[in-house]
């Protein structure tokens, strides 16, 4: 052991060229840390001390300004500090800063499928929001696996992130290790869009049951009575809730719940493409496709069969993603705005990082919107 301080629970170990820094139970790993921190051969050509000497202020004042920390420094001096730093191409040493401030100004995001247009948009919106507040965001993808969720969580904590946004890959997973890991994280965690029920953790999501209800209710209002549902209900709470909304809308108007019109599909285009063959063999006049990828798989099958929307069958999609611009006619869809989701998720995280979060976990439920376009045919009332 090279250094220890029981008061602040900090210790530094060295194993060969690897330095292990433990801060309140969190382990950070660095190679050749002395060179990194010292910048002896590479890195900054100017130091905080040199900038401070040039502007006539203390190094601590310069550090506060360059790290965007609250301080009582005039606007004129702030401008001078930033001009000198820019002229000398000064780049703050983030590793050294994180050791001093006990924060890395980095956050982590785990999504199930980065190829999904919705999750890609969510990641982009969240990264932008984090950057506006001075945070960098590490974006990772679990491939929908609870085991990979667990491994990525551990990797992000090891790399010293200040908090984690988690979109779980398998909401029905009974993986005790993942539950234990989330419950005992040394940093704040916010579950986004999807959640493991019963886990005490901040959650931000849209009302998926309401979304399924709104989509189906709209089809009913347009005269449709035989409405198929293509949904991922076996491995997804979001899919299960959207299915519940679909069934609620049918019950409200006295239509039967017909299991022959409910079809299972994972949130991937090939899965939806395969399931769509059975959907289109029914007498359904409309389909509620419960995600953008599911809708794309359905559209691929329809195109191959030479069927048109809405002439042969009406479709309501989910997510209202950018992929919609590729198709004619444009798809009527339930919209859950990734930017709104990101804003609320970051708000929960900010409160936790600032110590303003309550002892109980917070749950934020947002209302989706129905975006009416051109993919639903209005049927005569007798249909």
Can you name each region flagged by the protein language model?
Residues 2-104:
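N-terminal helix-turn-helix DNA-binding module of bacterial transcription factors
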Residues 213-255, 260, 358-376:
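An alpha-beta-alpha
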